[in-house]
């Protein structure tokens, strides 16, 4: 990827009972693409990232915790300002992911929203003229 970088910008928050809070926050920067992934980190992880002073703006944001209401706060998203939001979630999952609150916040940003339960495999790659977005639906397990 030439001059691209992948950086751990947050190492999570240690807790006794919530392993989601240990999620790493990763930032990729390359020609034509910036990407932010906060794993399953929840509101407290987002607050720590905001307080850290890290540069959070990204073209593409992988929605935290499958698009859960436990994260993806308005304050955090206002700093990220993604053009594209990727949501990894199973079709008809037991948790109701993605939740309506984050979906409304993503829409208010005007971001393109892509979901694995609807579009299948999501591939984002740097391209000379920006990012390349591809989806692949074949093979989605309708019963999952």
Residue ranges and their predicted role:
Residues 1-60, 118-144:
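Core dinuclear metal-dependent hydrolase active-site scaffold
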């Amino acid at each position: 990827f030439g001059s691209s970088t992948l950086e751990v910008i947050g190492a999570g928050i240690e807790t006794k009972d919530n392993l989601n809070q240990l999620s790493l926050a990763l930032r990729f920067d390359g020609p034509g693409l910036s990407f932010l992934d906060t794993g399953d980190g929840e509101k407290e992880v987002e607050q720590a990232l905001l307080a850290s002073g890290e540069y959070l703006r990204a073209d593409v944001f992988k929605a935290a915790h499958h698009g859960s209401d436990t994260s993806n706060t308005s304050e955090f998203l206002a700093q990220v300002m993604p053009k594209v939001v990727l949501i990894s979630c199973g079709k008809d999952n037991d948790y109701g992911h993605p939740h309506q609150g984050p979906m409304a916040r993503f829409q208010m940003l005007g971001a393109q929203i892509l979901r694995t339960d609807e579009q299948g495999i999501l591939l984002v790659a740097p391209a000379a003229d920006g990012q390349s977005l591809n989806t692949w639906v074949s093979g989605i397990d309708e019963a999952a």
